Swiss-Prot record:
Binding site for Ca(2+) 4: A132, E138, D142, E150
Domain of life, source organism: Bacteria
This protein's name: CRISPR-associated protein Csn2
Gene: csn2
Required cofactor(s): Ca(2+)
Molecular function GO labels: DNA binding; metal ion binding
CDD domains (alphabetical): Csn2
Binding site for Ca(2+) 2: D118, E138, D142, E150
Task of the protein: CRISPR (clustered regularly interspaced short palindromic repeat), is an adaptive immune system that provides protection against mobile genetic elements (viruses, transposable elements and conjugative plasmids). CRISPR clusters contain sequences complementary to antecedent mobile elements and target invading nucleic acids. CRISPR clusters are transcribed and processed into CRISPR RNA (crRNA). Binds dsDNA, binding is disrupted by EGTA.
UniProt-listed Pfam families: Cas_Csn2
Amino-acid positions noted as binding Ca(2+) 3 in the UniProt annotation, renumbered to this chain: D122, G123, E128, A132
Amino acid sequence: MRVNFSLLEEPIEIEKATFLTIKDVQSFAHLVKLIYQYDGENELKLFDAQQKGLKPTELFVVTDILGYDVNSAATLKLIYGDLEAQLNDKPEVKSMIEKLTGTISQLIGYELLEHEMDLEEDGIIVQELFKALGIKIETTSDTIFEKVMEITQVHRYLSKKKLLIFINACTYLTEDEVQQVVEYISLNNVDVLFLEQRVVQNRFQYILDENFYLSYEKA
């Protein structure tokens, strides 16, 4: 994956864990705004090696780490879709589930007939069953570091998301924690961009200084 915007002379390649530090506050804020407004048409360009642009739905952006809900409706919808696809590979199991949900719908239908009001039901589809069962991601994070790892794990399993961007995440992590996150990202072979306003210590990174000169160095 590659990123380009007006302050860069050439695109930056995002491969596994990539760090980009922008020292000028206004430029940093402008890029954050472009990321949030990304539609594939503004000055921010995200694309792969074949020059194919990243779709807005393929971008996963996190600023408020502790406040980020890994069990958001959008995330659960993707997970339910993956589970349904998994069931499609097991026709016997899916058939059994459909028979059981059909029986449940039939029993409830009998009760609706006996109710004083005219009631109807639409039946149960598989994804609605997942929701009714309360299927969600188990969350055990107590620290910002654990939450970063948790979010990265979620990104790993969301097949429709191709790029995760953390904004100012390293501000809250120790050098050792950053190293563990980098190792986890590498192990899972996902692309993650860490956009920072301060230099990340002891880490190779792209640094855009106050004079808009881009360098790649270890701070």
